[in-house]
Amino acid sequence: MADAPTFNAQPCDIITQLVLGPVSPRVRNARQASADRWMEIETILHESTRHDGVAPFSEQFLRGMEEPDLNHWHALVRVDGHVRGIAAVDPSGPAVELAVHPSYRRGGLATALQRAVRAHASSLGLGDERDIHTNGIGLTWWAHGDLPPARAAAEHIGATADRELLVMELPGSVVKDESDNNPVAQAAATLPDDVTVLSWTESARRWGKDAVDAAWLAVNNEAFDWHPEQGGWDQARLDQARRASWYDPDGVLLLWGSEGDQKDGDTDSLPPLLGFHWTKLAREGDDETGRKVGEVYVIGLARKAQGRGLGRASTAKGIQYLASNDAAYVELYVEADNAPAVHAYEALGFTVVERHTAWKF
């Protein structure tokens, strides 16, 4: 722990550690935060969400606090002995997210956390700490909601906007509309007759889990060879993603082509996988009282399947699956500069509700 420096006349000190460990205060060891510290961290995240109208940490960073094998690194900033801010580094990006309690903002705590992250950069192989103030360190800082304080903090340290991610939402009135005039139903009806949609569970039962996973990974990596987070997956990365508490194999919809004999158990007759729609269904809040929220989590198409309207049809099929499982509404994330995708989602009834900015520093 460093001596207590002063940033903008607000005394604070920084604690850094490799892994916080499980959020539950009942499960602790030497590498994990104390129960009191966890309560303070959870308070920061809760109050930030309530104040800003958007959560400061994405799912990957929340998992990084619970799962040591993700190897996330954390810095905590304390004022008067209490944690008032947290920064997290995901080495796979590398990417950063941070949060400061709303009552302690504009006091230099975000700057203190950013300095701690900069000091950690050399251990990630991102350059010498003495040079990073002028040359940058190659980290991506995600500012959720693109709020003015975050934008000001980013500009203060010389960061530049690199990506913008839109959150789009389909209201419950559209999700639950079963009429033929529903744009979702109309899009689902365009699925070609020679394409069969099966869940991962159904597919694995027919052709074996290993063959299905291999086909899924091949399409994923072909579809996202350009993507910094979704591309280049292997079996270990897929297994890691499936450890999320909300994961349901029935919610992974796979689009199979018509070639090949589809006898049960005959893995040699695996037909070509044209694409997939990985849906997500979770609850708002931290308990079972919140509404179910559906998400168009990942959609990927093989190159040979592109240009056939399968993206639109598979999106609609996934929304129908989420609706059948009582989703109150459906959301998705899309790159702001992907105009064709944004227009396609708008045609289904989605509207933009949030903007998230990735800053390079």
From Swiss-Prot:
> What keywords appear on the UniProt entry?
Acyltransferase, Repeat, Transferase
Q: What Enzyme Commission number(s) does the record list for this chain?
A: 2.3.1.189
Q: Which residues bind 1D-myo-inositol 2-(L-cysteinylamino)-2-deoxy-alpha-D-glucopyranoside?
A: 59, 229, 280, 295, 333
Question: GO: which molecular function terms?
Answer: mycothiol synthase activity; protein-N-terminal-alanine acetyltransferase activity
Q: Which SUPFAM superfamilies match?
A: Acyl-CoA N-acyltransferases (Nat)
- Source domain of life is Bacteria
* Presence of keyword Repeat: yes
Single GO biological process annotation from the record = mycothiol biosynthetic process
CDD domains found in the cross-reference section: NAT_SF (cd04301)
Could you say which residues bind acetyl-CoA 2 here? 299-301, 306-312, 338-343
User: N-acetyltransferase domain: from which residue to which, for each copy?
Assistant: 25-173, 195-361
Q: Could you tell me which InterPro entries the record lists for this protein?
A: Acyl_CoA_acyltransferase, GNAT_dom, MshD_Acetyltransferase, Mycothiol_AcTrfase
Residues that bind acetyl-CoA 1, according to the entry? 98-100
Query: What PROSITE patterns does the record point to?
Result: GNAT
Subunit note: Monomer.
Q: What is its biological role?
A: Catalyzes the transfer of acetyl from acetyl-CoA to desacetylmycothiol (Cys-GlcN-Ins) to form mycothiol.
- Family according to the record: Belongs to the acetyltransferase family. MshD subfamily.
Recorded protein name is Mycothiol acetyltransferase
Q: Which organism is it from?
A: Corynebacterium kroppenstedtii (strain DSM 44385 / JCM 11950 / CIP 105744 / CCUG 35717)
